[in-house]
A protein has these predicted regions:
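Sec-dependent N-terminal signal peptides
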Residues: 3-12
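Short, low-complexity N-terminal intrinsically disordered segments enriched in polar/charged residues
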Residues: 14-49, 53, 57, 161-162
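Short beta-strand edge/turn micro-motifs at domain boundaries
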Residues: 19-20, 127-155
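Short solvent-exposed beta->alpha transition segments
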Residues: 38, 56-94
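Hydrophobic pocket/interface hotspot
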Residues: 43, 54-56, 63, 110, ...
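A mature extracytoplasmic/lumenal domain signature
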Residues: 59, 69-71, 112-116, 128, ...
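Surface-exposed, charged secondary-structure patches
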Residues: 76-123
Length: 163
């Protein structure tokens, strides 16, 4: 619960406050936003290719994954997520587009829309947010949250999967 409150505060703090100090929040693309986006994409690609060692490299073990659906919210630790993902033979594939990345110092947020496929078939889409921090000079995902909408509410600009 404490992490949820902190995460909500961070999102609130990024959107409010004295605008004269907000010029240090970066919304345009630069080397830092590119490196943050790269970490998120690498993590998702590693999950999609079942390379859990590579995925774990980009994620803090102590963090959490939150799923928000019409029937409520659930969460689990990053460790639990990787254990469950590694124990399955399901083929995952996720694509993201139009990420919005903000950072200040060693804290960053990446917000994106995505679609998700299981065993080569479209499953769902939604919005996904990642909270990252810089640890020993490299960006790592602390927590991430996503909505999981039913297929009829999805409009991916990426078209069908090309194998």
């Amino acid at each position: 619960m404490k992490k949820i409150i902190i995460l909500c505060f961070l999102f609130y703090a990024c959107g409010t406050g004295d605008r004269s100090t907000m010029n240090s929040v970066h919304l345009k693309t630069d080397a830092t936003t590119d490196s943050i986006e790269h970490v998120v994409k690498e993590m998702l690609l590693a999950i999609s290719t079942n390379d859990l060692a590579k995925a774990k490299y980009h994620v803090l073990e102590e963090g959490r994954v939150f799923r928000v659906r019409n029937d409520g919210m659930s969460f689990r630790s990053n460790s639990e997520f990787f254990k469950q993902t590694g124990d399955q033979t399901t083929d995952y594939f996720e694509r993201m587009w139009d990420p919005i990345i903000m950072y200040r110092g060693d804290l960053a947020v990446a917000w994106t829309t995505y679609d998700f496929h299981l065993n080569g078939k479209f499953s769902h889409c939604g919005a996904e947010s990642f909270t990252l921090t810089r640890v020993d000079g490299r960006w790592m995902v602390m927590d991430w949250a996503y909505t999981a909408n039913e297929p009829e509410n999805c409009n991916s600009p990426l078209g069908p999967i090309v194998n």
